[in-house]
């Protein structure tokens, strides 16, 4: 484990000790858990659903596969994966227990509880043996990890040979004018939505800031390769507002 006692990282635009970030991220998602899915729809005007479908299209789930859905929260990616696969099993891991509670409710309502496990844990120190899973996904979560490279290294470790990594995350628009317009929307509208719908402006201010601090597409692609993944590629979604990164453990 890396010694984080004297190191700093970012929490949105704020510089904080590495040892504090996980707890502060946990506080954000504990605060918004019950409204998280609704806010995703409102903030993206439903477009996040199209991005997740694009993720499933590229991933092409197969029957019998074992999925690890990290930062899986309320289970949205896992449910989509299992429905596409026909049958299989998903383990949803998240740092925030209250997000998993919401996911369990969804699983029970959908009569899918027997296909899912829910685990509280850290993406940088996964509580699983080497070579356990066929697929690893993390959707809108890796930018909240204190050391994303360590999370990618852990993804490589727990995937079986032939296993696949798929990351869906907000990214950077290549056109500066479009990025400026998107920033105006993000910083002026999304925190206000957070206050109106979830009663929490600060958490959504953090989420907007965290997007701007995340590496661009090419930088993150190098991180995927540095973790050991091969055939690593990315696909922009909505002109780069979001991006999919894929890699294989061969």
Swiss-Prot record:
Catalytic activity: a 2-demethylmenaquinol + S-adenosyl-L-methionine = a menaquinol + S-adenosyl-L-homocysteine + H(+); a 2-methoxy-6-(all-trans-polyprenyl)benzene-1,4-diol + S-adenosyl-L-methionine = a 5-methoxy-2-methyl-3-(all-trans-polyprenyl)benzene-1,4-diol + S-adenosyl-L-homocysteine + H(+)
GO biological process, one term: aerobic respiration
Residues spanning the membrane: none
Entry keywords, A to Z: Menaquinone biosynthesis, Methyltransferase, S-adenosyl-L-methionine, Transferase, Ubiquinone biosynthesis
Gene3D superfamilies per UniProt: Vaccinia Virus protein VP39
InterPro entries given in the database record: SAM-dependent_MTases_sf, UbiE/COQ5_MeTrFase, UbiE/COQ5_MeTrFase_CS
Entry's Gene Ontology molecular function annotations: 2-methoxy-6-polyprenyl-1,4-benzoquinol methyltransferase activity; demethylmenaquinone methyltransferase activity
Keyword Membrane attached: no
Pathway: Quinol/quinone metabolism; menaquinone biosynthesis; menaquinol from 1,4-dihydroxy-2-naphthoate: step 2/2; Cofactor biosynthesis; ubiquinone biosynthesis
Enzyme category, top tier: transferase
EC number(s) given by UniProt: 2.1.1.163, 2.1.1.201
Binding site for S-adenosyl-L-methionine: 74, 94, 122-123, 139
Described function: Methyltransferase required for the conversion of demethylmenaquinol (DMKH2) to menaquinol (MKH2) and the conversion of 2-polyprenyl-6-methoxy-1,4-benzoquinol (DDMQH2) to 2-polyprenyl-3-methyl-6-methoxy-1,4-benzoquinol (DMQH2).
Alphabetized HAMAP family for the sequence: MenG_UbiE_methyltr
Similarity comment: family membership: Belongs to the class I-like SAM-binding methyltransferase superfamily. MenG/UbiE family.
Protein known as: Ubiquinone/menaquinone biosynthesis C-methyltransferase UbiE
Organism in which the protein naturally occurs: Roseobacter denitrificans (strain ATCC 33942 / OCh 114)
